[in-house]
Structure formats: C-alpha cells, structure tokens
Amino acid sequence: MKLKFCGFTSIKDVTAASQLPIDAIGFIHYEKSKRHQTITQIKKLASAVPNHIDKVCVMVNPDLTTIEHVLSNTSINTIQLHGTESIDFIQEIKKKYSSIKITKALAADENIIQNINKYKGFVDLFIIDTPSVSYGGTGQTYDWTILKHIKDIPYLIAGGINSENIQTVNQLKLSHQGYDLASGIEVNGRKDIEKMTAIVNIVKGDRDNE
C-alpha cells in the first residue's frame, strides 16, 4: 500500500515525514487553502525531501504558466490537479513535461465512474476525495462502499482518513493502491509525528503489498 502525506508547511515537518517509509509528500499551491505555499516556499520545502519520495504540488485549475513556474523553480516531480482541468490541458502538460507524473483528484459522488472514464489513460493516478462545494481537502469522510465498483484503476483514498478509521476501509477489500492524508496526521494544524508513525505502522506493516 502506498502513502501520500499532504499539506506540509514547515521544514521540520517535512524532515520528520521523510524519515518514514512513505511514497509521496505534497505541497499545496492554491491561495484559498489554509495550507497554501508560495513557489519559493515549495522550493525550500521540496529540497528537504529525499529523491526516493515523490514531491507533489497540488493545484486547482492552474494555467500552464503557473505549472511552468513550479516545475522550473522547484524539484517537484508530480502535479496533482484538483479542479475541472480539461483533457486537452492535461495533454499539453504531458507533451511539454513528459517525465512529470499527473494525478487527478475526483469527488466520490454519483459521477465518479463517469469522471474516471473521462480522465483514464491521461493521468497516472487518481485521488478519490470527499465531495465538497469548494476545492481541496475537507477532513470529512464519505461512504467508502461507493468505491467497490472501481477496479483496475490506480487510486488513493483521501478524505478524513486517520488511524482510527483506516481499519474500517481495509476491511472493505477495495482495489485502492493506498491513502492520501492531511488533517488525519495533524494536531492543531501541524503535522504530528505520532499520528504519521501510527498510519505508517498500519499501512506499511504486515499489509504492505508492494
């Protein structure tokens, strides 16, 4: 199982997380997010992440110029799109930056299968998150059984996942590749090493299927 920890805002937290066997660390570049980081800040934070961990920049409906600024000024190797980005736009990114991974976040709603089919083949990974009227993480969960119909597609489960409820998700025997956490590894808005370690022990312990 893969683990992505997201929404980092301090070198201290990045360094602590990087000592754990996780697969990706995310930084949010979206001004309406409480975890927003400037490109300069992301450059500094990403430089503290070792090369074996993917460095993800989360954006909402960015233009190509913004993506160019992120990729040319930081060590980011994955772009995570949280808006209504078009297939043409994604293809444009891929054409210009063939080595960059692209992740697409989708809401776990009645249109999930339709939206997966729309983006399938154009992105490297899906993040399936709690439906929300605004973009970005809510810290709220959803009915995970909606994911039972999703097979043969690489995706991570996001949305209020923490060490208390992750076992419930595991018992559903879904086809997900792992989890994406932000608020579930925080205390008072800061990443918490005990919470991060607890999640790692659950997900990367005897259930690691990589």
UniProtKB/Swiss-Prot annotation:
Please give the catalytic activity noted in the UniProt record.
Answer: N-(5-phospho-beta-D-ribosyl)anthranilate = 1-(2-carboxyphenylamino)-1-deoxy-D-ribulose 5-phosphate
Q: Which domain of life is it from?
A: Bacteria
**Keyword annotations:** Amino-acid biosynthesis, Aromatic amino acid biosynthesis, Isomerase, Tryptophan biosynthesis
Q: Which region is the signal sequence?
A: none
Broad EC category: isomerase
Q: Which GO terms describe its biological process?
A: L-tryptophan biosynthetic process
Q: What is its EC number?
A: 5.3.1.24
Metabolic or biological pathway? Amino-acid biosynthesis; L-tryptophan biosynthesis; L-tryptophan from chorismate: step 3/5
In the record, what terms sit under GO molecular function? phosphoribosylanthranilate isomerase activity
Alphabetical list of Pfam families matching this protein = PRAI
In the UniProt record, does the keyword DNA-binding occur?
no
Family that this chain belongs to: Belongs to the TrpF family.
Protein's name in the database: N-(5'-phosphoribosyl)anthranilate isomerase
